[in-house]
UniProtKB/Swiss-Prot annotation:
Entries under Pfam families matching the protein: Urease_beta (PF00699)
NCBIfam families per record: PRK13203.1, urease_beta
Organism per entry: Bacillus subtilis (strain 168)
Pathway: Nitrogen metabolism; urea degradation; CO(2) and NH(3) from urea (urease route): step 1/1
One cellular-component annotation, GO: urease complex
Top-tier EC class: hydrolase
Taxon lineage: Bacteria, Bacillati, Bacillota, Bacilli, Bacillales
Name of this protein: Urease subunit beta
Domain of life from the UniProt record: Bacteria
Keyword Transmembrane helix carried by entry: no
Single GO biological process annotation from the record: urea catabolic process
Quaternary context: Heterotrimer of UreA (gamma), UreB (beta) and UreC (alpha) subunits. Three heterotrimers associate to form the active enzyme.
Entry EC no(s): 3.5.1.5
Amino acid sequence: MKPGAFQIAEGTITINEGREIREVTVKNTGSRSIQVGSHFHFAEANGALLFDRELAIGMRLDVPSGTSVRFEPGEQKTVSLVEIRGRKTIRGLNGMADTFIDERGKEKTLANLKQAGWMEGVIR
């Protein structure tokens, strides 16, 4: 095998197998395209996106690593979300979570999203 060469296994790889999956319908209420990456905490995605943010707390897009989903202005689509694993600690991003995602962390995140006005899908 040459340095840098790829060695691909045969068969099908199923990503996020055995993890909790949720579907959520998302609408871009803004005037610009919005792109969300594979490992972004979906509940904290752009405030112009209208969807059930409470359902999305502790979840990310169920897409291959390094990819994203784009939402055009006015577009509505259903996406699959998968639970964030590992230590379930969310830091940075839009500062709505910045916590460990347990019941208390979910309540804190939900309160921050409501206070910011992000539950309505409009930027204030």
